[in-house]
From Swiss-Prot:
EC number of the protein: 4.3.2.10
Native source species: Lactococcus lactis subsp. cremoris (strain SK11)
Recorded GO CC terms: cytoplasm
Subunit-structure text: Heterodimer of HisH and HisF.
Function: IGPS catalyzes the conversion of PRFAR and glutamine to IGP, AICAR and glutamate. The HisF subunit catalyzes the cyclization activity that produces IGP and AICAR from PRFAR using the ammonia provided by the HisH subunit.
EC main group: lyase
Protein name: Imidazole glycerol phosphate synthase subunit HisF
Family, per entry: Belongs to the HisA/HisF family.
Lineage summary: Bacteria, Bacillati, Bacillota, Bacilli, Lactobacillales
Recorded superkingdom: Bacteria
Catalytic activity reported: 5-[(5-phospho-1-deoxy-D-ribulos-1-ylimino)methylamino]-1-(5-phospho-beta-D-ribosyl)imidazole-4-carboxamide + L-glutamine = D-erythro-1-(imidazol-4-yl)glycerol 3-phosphate + 5-amino-1-(5-phospho-beta-D-ribosyl)imidazole-4-carboxamide + L-glutamate + H(+)
Keyword Nucleotide-binding part of the UniProt annotation: no
Gene behind the chain: hisF
Keywords, sorted A to Z: Amino-acid biosynthesis, Cytoplasm, Histidine biosynthesis, Lyase
Length: 259
């Protein structure tokens, strides 16, 4: 089993970290960069900044925030929200991000995935997919615009297309599970993980360390992304990793020297 990544996600609105349930009822938590620095100290493998209103309200992510984060963090930073063109990719990467996450724009212009992969490399291209079960519960459908618009597109088919176009990894969020703290959507994750050969990041629903252990034991997810568990002090990244290792799930832990 490859080393599993633990990735705190900071949902950002108006420059502040927020967290809600099922994409609504948002509560402001704090400064993105200061929170990210705490997670890095706790041994987070990467950080994700998602501007959750940028796509819907057609606002661009503030480059200054990205630049400040890039200067103060040494772990990889993925940035998403409001990415609509190859120029947006160029601007975000130039500001200091290591990867760019696209969601709505990938659906509206799938060629953007291919174009970005060719120009910047597949390692820079993350396709974020928000999905939920259809009415019958037999399959999953893709949503865009911050989860406000149902595209009617089948999740598994879209994930396969993203891989073919050049996506380096998929960030898969279950809208049914997001913010509920009831565990990851294992059925959704298994459906996608079994259909693609690129890394899949599990997102939506983490409420305890046992949920993280479960997602790695019961799916082929390469990484786990979460917010609520960390933002409200219910667990730390290093506590999560220690439990993973106890359960024979490989995780990176850097022990700091005591001077």
């Amino acid at each position: 089993m490859l080393t599993k990544r633990i990735i705190p996600c900071l949902d950002i609105k108006n420059g502040k970290v927020v967290k809600g349930i099922n994409f609504v009822g948002l509560k402001e938590i704090g400064d993105p960069v200061e929170i990210a620095k705490i997670y890095e100290e706790q041994c987070a493998d990467e950080i994700v900044f998602l501007d959750i209103t940028a796509s819907f309200e057609e606002r661009e992510i503030i480059g200054e925030l990205i630049g400040r984060a890039a200067r103060e963090l040494s772990i990889p930073l993925t940035v998403g929200g409001g990415i609509r063109s190859i120029n947006d990719f160029r601007r975000i990467l130039a500001s200091g991000a290591d990867k760019v996450s696209i969601n709505s724009a990938a659906i509206e212009n799938p060629e953007l995935i291919h174009q970005a992969a060719n120009e910047f490399g597949v390692q820079c291209v993350v396709v974020a997919i928000d999905a939920k079960a259809n009415e019958s519960g037999s399959s999953f459908e893709v949503y865009i615009k911050g989860g406000r618009e149902n595209t009617g597109i089948d999740l598994v088919e879209w994930a396969k297309k993203c891989e073919k176009l050049g996506a380096g990894e998929i960030l898969l969020t279950s809208m049914d599970k997001d913010g509920t703290k009831t565990g990851y959507d294992l059925k959704m994750l298994n459906a996608v993980c079994s259909a693609v050969n690129i890394p899949v990041i599990a997102s939506g629903g983490c409420g305890s360390i046992s949920d993280i252990i479960e997602v790695f034991e019961k799916t082929k997810s390469d990484a786990a992304l979460f917010a609520s568990l960390f933002h409200y002090g219910e667990a730390t990244v290093d506590e999560v990793k220690e439990e993973l290792i106890k359960n024979r799930i490989p995780a990176r832990i850097i022990k700091k020297e005591i001077i």
